[in-house]
Amino acid sequence: MYKYLDIPGWFNMHDAYMNIVKYVDDGQTIVEIGCFAGRSTRFLLDGLDYAGKHKVKVHVIDTFEGSGMEHAKVNLSPMYDEFMRNLDDYIQDERIIVHVNRSDNQNILDSFATNSVAAVIIDGDHTMEAVEKDVYNWWPKVMEGGIMVGDDVRLDSVKQGCYKGLAKHGIDSVTHVRGEEGWFAKIKHPDADKLGEQLKLIPGVNSMKLNG
């Protein structure tokens, strides 16, 4: 469970990822948009391993070219190779499937059936337009009872992008879990808002319903 600490990158969604590990069933599918060098991916897979859920497939989607100002001063040229090294064991076991592409690539979107994904993690391009597109494109892929989460909701671009993407599906609220940088979550369930209030694992981290 500690190998992720040796991997460079930004990762503050431990509680979000542990909720996914807790509720996903063995054999289901997870999609992670934006993985950088694999710090968060390593944490997720090690958590699934610890939980005995060895048949979960995790699809990671990343251009490995970075996006926006958050990567402006980072040398990303070796990032793909570093990711592959950091996750080699899980890749060899075919528990991680790597898609080197944009998250709005139509062929990738078409490869996932509607209502087929247990969890979608959005942590790619943080511009409002990109977040809106990711939320809008990937929400239909989330199965009933599944969850969509995204990082850095403290950024107005992420918050507004999330609202706008869900609004296009007729959804007017989202759970905001307040931590160091904050993350959003939406569960596909008739009692989504009530269930969202339970997304709290770390003492001092509170969740609340926000309306777009």
Predicted feature locations:
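S-adenosylmethionine/decaboxylated-SAM
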Residues: 2-212
